[in-house]
Amino acid sequence: KIPNILKGGLKSICKHRKYLDKACAAI
């Protein structure tokens, strides 16, 4: 569903932006 590069990038963002926790959980 999500390209690995984008997925990895989102995970990195999740570590720094807690407000994305819900989006991160969906990954």
UniProtKB/Swiss-Prot annotation:
Molecular function as annotated in GO: toxin activity
Highest taxon in the source lineage: Eukaryota
Subcellular location: Secreted
Gene Ontology biological process terms from the UniProt entry: cytolysis in another organism; defense response to insect; venom-mediated perturbation of biological process
The keyword ATP-binding is annotated on this UniProt entry: no
Cellular component GO terms, alphabetical: extracellular region
Keywords: Disulfide bond, Secreted, Toxin
Expression sites (tissue/organ): Expressed by the venom gland.
Oligomeric and partner information: Heterodimer composed of subunit A and subunit B (DELTA-PSDTX-Pp1a); disulfide-linked.
Function statement: This heterodimer has insecticidal and cytotoxic properties. Induces immediate paralysis when injected into blowflies (Lucilia cuprina), and then death within 24 hours. Also inhibits the growth of Aedes albopictus mosquito C6/36 cells.
Additional record remark: Electrospray ionization experiments give a mass of 6598.6 Da for DELTA-pseudomyrmecitoxin-Pp1a heterodimer (subunits A+B).
Protein's name according to its UniProt entry: DELTA-pseudomyrmecitoxin-Pp1a subunit A
Organism: Pseudomyrmex penetrator (Ant)
